[in-house]
């Protein structure tokens, strides 16, 4: 048996997230059906994470085992023939039999994009959060400095998050602005459900002047989801890279 590692890009707009589920079409389901058509056998993908409905990925990593002896390029060009335009396999590689995409990941890089302008942009609506009022990016960056380190992120998760522990390590949070776009890059060891989106929503509330930058430090010491910011829309979030 071979273990094949795939790097996948997708626009999550029309999907109910990565993971196969009873209600709604998932990215994983579409990929597994394409591989079934290519290989003539059903495979089960194991991924480096589970993006939520509407969240995008530039480099989701997933693996599967197969007895087929196809060349690696066939897993790219061949499978892509059976995939819709909003999902593509970028590369395929042989992996060790014990490779585990989520457990072996050293860090993940997420990017949250904000379109900060008075008037909405139809061309950016699927890949950014439109915030009308001007944001103070200097205040947002001051707030972001509190995130790196190992902290209790209970205030920055979904109410239905079932993680056994809310301790997570964040390596860096940076904010860059270019014209009307504000980009929040978050790199960390692992994330709770909706964690990056709540972080982004809280930083936007700092930028709006609703919170002082020190609110982030307070929330990490006093984890209360109700005292954090809104959950930013899924459309602005993208998984950029997974490091091993």
UniProtKB/Swiss-Prot annotation:
- State the InterPro entries in the record: PsdUridine_synth_cat_dom_sf (IPR020103), PsdUridine_synth_TruA (IPR001406), PsdUridine_synth_TruA_a/b_dom (IPR020097), PsdUridine_synth_TruA_C (IPR020095), TruA/RsuA/RluB/E/F_N (IPR020094)
Listed EC numbers: 5.4.99.12
Binding sites annotated in the UniProt record for substrate: 110
Note the Gene3D superfamilies from the entry.
Answer: Pseudouridine synthase I, catalytic domain, C-terminal subdomain (3.30.70.660), Pseudouridine synthase I, catalytic domain, N-terminal subdomain (3.30.70.580)
Look at the named UniProt entry and state the broad enzyme category this protein falls under: isomerase
**Residues annotated as catalytic:** 52
Task: List the molecular function annotations (GO) for this entry.
Answer: RNA binding; tRNA pseudouridine(38-40) synthase activity
Keywords in alphabetical order: Isomerase, tRNA processing
Q: What's a BP term from Gene Ontology annotated to this protein?
A: tRNA pseudouridine synthesis
Q: Which reaction does it catalyse?
A: uridine(38/39/40) in tRNA = pseudouridine(38/39/40) in tRNA
Q: Which residues form a coiled coil?
A: none
Family matches, as PANTHER family: PSEUDOURIDYLATE SYNTHASE, TRNA PSEUDOURIDINE SYNTHASE-LIKE 1
Q: State how it assembles.
A: Homodimer.
State the similarity comment: Belongs to the tRNA pseudouridine synthase TruA family.
Role summary: Formation of pseudouridine at positions 38, 39 and 40 in the anticodon stem and loop of transfer RNAs.
Protein name according to UniProt: tRNA pseudouridine synthase A
Q: Which organism is it from?
A: Pelobacter propionicus (strain DSM 2379 / NBRC 103807 / OttBd1)
What high-level taxonomic lineage is stated for the organism? Bacteria, Pseudomonadati, Thermodesulfobacteriota, Desulfuromonadia, Desulfuromonadales
The primary gene name is truA
């Amino acid at each position: 048996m071979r273990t094949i590692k795939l790097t996948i890009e997708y626009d999550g707009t029309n999907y109910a997230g990565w993971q196969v589920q009873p209600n709604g079409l998932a990215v994983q389901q579409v990929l597994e059906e394409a591989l079934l058509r290519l290989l003539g056998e059903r495979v089960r993908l194991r991924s480096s994470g589970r993006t939520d409905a509407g969240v995008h990925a530039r480099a989701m990593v997933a693996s599967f085992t197969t007895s087929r002896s196809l060349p690696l390029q066939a897993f790219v060009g061949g499978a892509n023939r059976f995939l819709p335009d909003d999902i593509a396999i970028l590369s395929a590689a042989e992996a060790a039999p014990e490779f585990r995409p989520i457990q072996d990941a050293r860090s993940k890089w997420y990017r949250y994009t904000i379109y900060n302008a008075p008037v909405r942009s139809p061309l950016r609506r699927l890949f950014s959060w439109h915030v009308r009022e001007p944001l103070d990016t200097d205040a947002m960056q001051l707030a972001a400095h509190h995130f790196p380190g190992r902290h209790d992120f209970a205030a920055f998760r979904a109410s239905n998050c079932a993680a056994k522990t809310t301790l997570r390590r964040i390596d860096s949070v940076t904010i860059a602005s270019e014209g009307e776009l504000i980009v929040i890059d978050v790199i960390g060891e692992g994330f709770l459900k909706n964690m990056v989106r709540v972080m982004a929503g809280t930083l936007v509330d700092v930028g709006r002047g609703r919170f002082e930058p020190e609110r982030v430090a307070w929330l990490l010491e006093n984890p209360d989801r109700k005292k954090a910011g809104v959950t930013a829309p899924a459309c602005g979030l993208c998984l950029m890279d997974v490091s091993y």
